[in-house]
Amino acid sequence: MSRARAHVVVSGKVQGVYFRSETRDQALALGVTGWIRNRTDGTVEGVFEGDREMVEKLVRWCWQGPPAAEVSNVQVEWQDYTGEFSGFKIAF
């Protein structure tokens, strides 16, 4: 099993639409660890770790987000897996 880490920044109408909580729910269902947070510039940022296939699924999900979201871009930086997370949290 190949492990992966993705640092993502999601742009568009992504705050105030339950993007963070829905991403957490998706991550937990996929067995992906990490965090997600709102940024002051209106984007949402996250770090996802786990099985490469599951991390890729979560990144693809970010392109749609929850029903009220209007995603315009998902920036992804693939990084080395660290295994530093034990769960998935909404960071503040």
Swiss-Prot record:
One of its GO terms (molecular function) is acylphosphatase activity. Transmembrane segments: none annotated. The active site is at R20, N38. SUPFAM superfamilies: Acylphosphatase/BLUF domain-like (SSF54975). Residues 5-92 form the Acylphosphatase-like domain. InterPro entries: Acylphosphatase, Acylphosphatase-like_dom, Acylphosphatase-like_dom_sf, Acylphosphatase_CS. Its EC number is 3.6.1.7. Keywords: Hydrolase. Pfam families: Acylphosphatase. It catalyses: an acyl phosphate + H2O = a carboxylate + phosphate + H(+). It comes from the Bacteria. Belongs to the acylphosphatase family. This is Acylphosphatase. The lineage of its organism: Bacteria, Bacillati, Bacillota, Clostridia, Eubacteriales. The gene is acyP.
